Amino acid sequence: MTVRPPRPAAPAEAPRPRLPEFDWPAYNSSELRSPKHELVIPPSGTTELYGPVFGPTDVHPLDADLTAQHTGDPLGERIVVTGRVLDESGRPLRNQLVEVWQANAAGRYPHKGDRHAAPLDPNFTGAGRCLTDDQGRYRFVSIKPGAYPWRNHHNAWRPAHIHFSLFGTAFTQRLVTQMYFPGDPLFAYDPIFNAVRDERARRRMIAAFDIDTTESEWALGYQWDIVLGGASATPTEDR
């Protein structure tokens, strides 16, 4: 009788970060926005036919400077936000389209649905985009956004944040997330930020002040890397 040695145990997968719930009770409107039907898988080959192809003629360098899109300077604290887009193994992802949008320094968005009684800034639209370079790096110049009320519950205020959107090799791979600023006193009260229940994952959504990125007498600098996949993935809104 031949006794076979036991099979080696399969290597344990790295634990995945706790990502936001689709339906988070503390975030009232998530009940309306969360999926109610099964996921629809696109036909094979669709992503290859309709995948995004971006080049230097599609994204202008000025698109990454949100303070230079109008005739005058916007109001508020000028900032530089930069970092790298990495895969789960830490390898840089080049030529990735990175889009951002945000409120102005008073906490107001320019769209008609924003009812916050704060002033609009005629010199600030609050949207930009760029392509990552060969090191996977992106860079934006902007104004630090203000906090704003959002009527989710009594005395509800959103911490200052910038929305980020990233495209992979197909439009179906789009990821959306939010970047926050260090030391914000509103973190403890924000159900969107706290929908990410893993504290380490929440910390990955917070940029780090960086004196080397800061430009003398011009702008404060922040570093924020975005990791797509793996145990160290940046939490996203669409998982």
Regions found by a protein language model. Name each.
Residues 2-239:
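Beta-strand-dominated extracellular/periplasmic modules and repeats
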